[in-house]
C-alpha cells in the first residue's frame, strides 16, 4: 500500500492538483508508521521497476542504503501512472483507501482513479 500512496501523491503533484508539501506527503503515506529503511527499500524497488524517478541512493556504513535526494525530487513515470490506472489490485487498494482514509481519498478523487 505504501507504493500506491507514494504514486498517488506524486501523480496528484504531476497533474498540478497539489504542490509537494513534505508534511502533507508524510501524513498521506503515514510515514510515522513506516520504518525508514523499509521506506528507502520501497523507493529503490519502485525506481528499479521504473514507477518513479529522481531518487538517489548511496550506500553508507557498509551496506546501509540511504536516500541522498529529497522526497520532493521523486517523480512518477509513465509506467507509474499506468500501474496506478491499470493494475487491478491497485484499484482495489484505491477503493479500500477511498473508504477508510480521508486524505488519500481526497487525492484519489482529485486525480480520478476510482
Annotate each language-model stretch with its function.
Residues 16-33:
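Short acidic, hydrophobic short linear motifs in intrinsically disordered regions
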Amino acid at each position: 500500500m505504501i507504493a500506491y500512496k507514494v504514486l498517488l501523491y506524486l501523480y496528484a503533484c504531476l497533474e498540478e492538483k497539489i504542490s509537494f508539501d513534505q508534511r502533507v506527503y508524510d501524513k498521506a503515506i503515514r510515514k510515522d508508521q513506516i520504518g525508514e529503511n523499509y521506506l528507502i527499500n520501497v523507493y529503490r524497488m519502485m525506481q528499479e521497476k521504473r514507477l518513479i524517478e529522481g531518487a538517489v541512493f548511496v550506500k553508507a556504513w557498509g551496506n546501509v542504503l540511504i536516500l541522498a535526494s529529497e522526497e520532493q525530487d521523486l517523480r512518477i513515470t509513465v509506467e507509474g501512472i499506468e500501474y496506478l490506472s491499470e493494475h487491478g489490485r491497485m484499484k482495489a487498494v484505491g477503493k479500500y483507501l477511498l473508504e477508510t482514509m480521508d486524505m488519500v481519498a481526497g487525492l484519489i478523487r482529485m486525480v480520478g482513479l476510482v
